[in-house]
């Protein structure tokens, strides 16, 4: 039985939420870290396919979909 994947909330997100999601994938990472503000980035073959600042209202709508489509799960 597979474990449920953590996803980001529908609005802004915290560093803790971003770290939990990024820890599940090899190609999702926190970048442009400025302390309180940072981006969660999805890459494919090294190329960025989507990114969202943690403070963007509603920014996770597309980010969650790109993670679902392009995210490469880490081996468990």
Swiss-Prot record:
It holds the Pfam family DUF905. Gene3D superfamilies: ykff protein like domains. InterPro entries: DUF905 (IPR009253), YkfF-like_sf (IPR038612). The keyword Chaperone does not apply. Keywords: Plasmid. It comes from the Bacteria. Belongs to the UPF0401 family. This is UPF0401 protein YubL. It comes from Yersinia pestis. The lineage of its organism: Bacteria, Pseudomonadati, Pseudomonadota, Gammaproteobacteria, Enterobacterales.
